[in-house]
């Protein structure tokens, strides 16, 4: 994918609408009713090291002539979700799907304990129109302890174990029977709004505060950073703490804080220019090869 992006950057005439660089990952199945998102759910561009992260920071500096405040958040390794509330009540939940259309998983999301079925009264004043729908977004994940327990039970019953908590969360979310989802011990972190004009907040930091007030599960490991050094420190600390967290993370998301500045930077075909995902170095582990079986193939 990275080589394809570099090729298209050097030769724009080769870019086609069917290119993977122009699409958001995911799919829409036939098991659940399709739901069209209020606004497109974008992917994020990746920075594979601090040098690439600095290149993005330089683009931000070039856009505004100075370093502007950014919000650093842990990148949860789960499944994206969009929750729609009308008159303060949860009326719909949808997967990201292809970014434009997702799947209706409302019945299943209602079983996730930390998803408020109704917004707290104190937060309704933060809605510009309390009766109008507002779409809030985040990540559904499975805690490490729940994942381990699920796989122990699966193996005990002769069923195939899940490869990782992310797959387990996605599979649990798309169950036909909500009772199965309810028993999978899913959790969420909510961190975004589809249309910031729906709320009386001016930036990401203020949005996170409103989400907490409204009753959502918001990750406490966030930081408002005003310098490149502060961003680096957050990323390095996240790498150090990765194994100790009760849930899986695979990076840090850095976002320009002010919504007005986000709007000024805009989007590419697949990702916002005002955000970047700093990806952790791949984990290295040792595998012990206990035995091999040598066989002769049918062609000798």
Ranges and model annotations:
Residues 1-299:
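RNA/tRNA-interacting regions in translation and RNA-turnover enzymes
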């Amino acid at each position: 994918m990275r080589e394809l992006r570099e090729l298209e950057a050097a030769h724009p005439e080769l870019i086609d609408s069917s290119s993977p660089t122009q699409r958001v990952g995911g799919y829409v199945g036939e098991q659940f009713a399709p739901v069209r998102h209020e606004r497109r759910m974008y992917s994020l561009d990746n920075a594979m090291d601090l040098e690439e992260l600095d290149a993005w920071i330089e683009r931000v500096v070039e856009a505004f002539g100075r370093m502007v405040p950014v919000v650093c958040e842990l990148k949860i390794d789960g499944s994206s979700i969009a929750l729609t509330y009308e008159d303060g009540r949860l009326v719909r939940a949808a997967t990201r799907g292809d970014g434009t259309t997702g799947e209706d998983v409302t019945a299943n999301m209602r079983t996730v304990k930390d998803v408020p079925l109704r917004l707290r009264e104190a937060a309704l004043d933060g809605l510009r129109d309390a009766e109008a729908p507002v779409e809030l977004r985040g990540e559904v994940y499975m805690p490490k302890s729940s994942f381990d327990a699920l796989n122990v039970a699966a193996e005990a019953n002769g069923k195939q174990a899940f490869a990782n908590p992310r797959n387990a969360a996605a599979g649990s979310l798309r169950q036909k029977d909500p009772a199965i989802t309810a028993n999978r011990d899913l959790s969420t972190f909510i961190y975004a709004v589809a249309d910031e004009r729906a709320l009386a907040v001016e930036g990401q930091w203020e949005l996170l505060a409103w989400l907490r007030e409204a009753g959502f599960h918001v990750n406490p490991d966030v930081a408002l950073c005003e310098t490149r050094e502060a961003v680096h420190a957050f990323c390095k600390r996240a790498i150090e703490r990765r194994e100790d967290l009760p849930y899986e993370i695979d990076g840090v998301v850095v976002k320009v804080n002010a919504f007005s500045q986000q709007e000024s930077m805009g989007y590419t075909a697949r990702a916002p220019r005002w955000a970047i995902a700093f990806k952790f170095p791949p984990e290295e582990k040792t595998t012990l090869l206990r035995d091999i079986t040598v066989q002769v193939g049918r062609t000798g």
